[in-house]
């Protein structure tokens, strides 16, 4: 598939955020040929290192925002695709509309903040309707949900957040919370394992 490389990079960025101890979400913008032209990752709990166009250490330092911020305003992007590992929130949906992108694909579901069903009813949005596709019904979607839930568990997310995930995506929640999951991801984090190794290891949790 022409987006396979873009999806791999998106998962790689999410895994980088997981290793850095922050919200594990990755996002890229792909051109009509599937080439990555912009990228970003979640940096909410990382200190700002001065990287141009990349928000960090604030509530809005989302992967999609950091990817879309790389697009120059000198053209429109109706023929480009925004790919993200997790169902985007309402802020990131609004940013996608502002960017002129009209196609958004997401890998994993977010039952708490995900806003894929939200429809922006403005003249601007009607001019360039945003078509949203997801989740992915394969190992990529499973991995995206798994590392997000594992991160929520590790970093003590509020009970309403955890309950929303347990109700909304119970299979992914059970796999992320089963015995051995925490130690597995601690080991991968300690080894600074590459994303392909992490996906392979995570498959042991998702195969049951």
What residue spans do the PLM features occupy?
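A short, polar/charged loop-to-alpha-helix boundary motif
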Residues: 43-61
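Immediate flanking context of iron-sulfur cluster ligation sites
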Residues: 76-86
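A short helix-loop-beta-strand connector motif used in the catalytic cores of GNAT acetyltransferases and
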Residues: 19-23
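Local cysteine-cluster metal-coordination motifs and their immediate loop/turn environment
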Residues: 84-102
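Glycine/small-residue-rich phosphate/adenosyl-binding loop
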Residues: 38, 60-73
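Zinc-dependent deaminase
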Residues: 1-17, 99-208
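Short beta->alpha transition motifs characteristic of CBS
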Residues: 35-45
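Short beta-strand scaffold segments in enzyme catalytic cores
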Residues: 25-31
């Amino acid at each position: 598939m022409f987006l396979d490389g873009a999806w791999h990079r998106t998962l790689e960025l999410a895994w980088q955020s997981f290793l850095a101890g922050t919200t594990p979400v990755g996002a890229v913008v792909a051109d009509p040929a599937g080439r990555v032209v912009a990228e970003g990752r979640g940096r909410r709990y990382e200190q700002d290192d001065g990287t141009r166009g990349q928000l960090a250490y604030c509530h809005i330092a989302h992967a999609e925002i950091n990817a879309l911020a790389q697009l120059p305003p000198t053209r429109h992007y109706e023929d480009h695709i925004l790919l993200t590992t997790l169902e985007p929130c309402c802020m990131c949906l609004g940013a996608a509309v502002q960017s002129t992108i009209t196609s958004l694909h997401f890998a994993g579901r977010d039952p708490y903040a995900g806003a894929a069903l939200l429809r922006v009813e403005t003249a601007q949005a009607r001019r360039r309707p945003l078509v949203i596709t997801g989740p992915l019904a394969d190992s990529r979607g499973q991995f995206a949900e798994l590392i997000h839930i594992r991160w929520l568990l590790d970093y003590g997310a509020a009970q309403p957040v955890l309950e929303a995930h347990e109700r909304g995506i119970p299979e992914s929640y059970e796999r992320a919370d089963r015995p051995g999951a925490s130690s597995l991801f601690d080991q991968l984090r300690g080894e600074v394992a590459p994303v392909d190794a992490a996906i392979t290891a995570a498959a042991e949790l998702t195969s049951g």
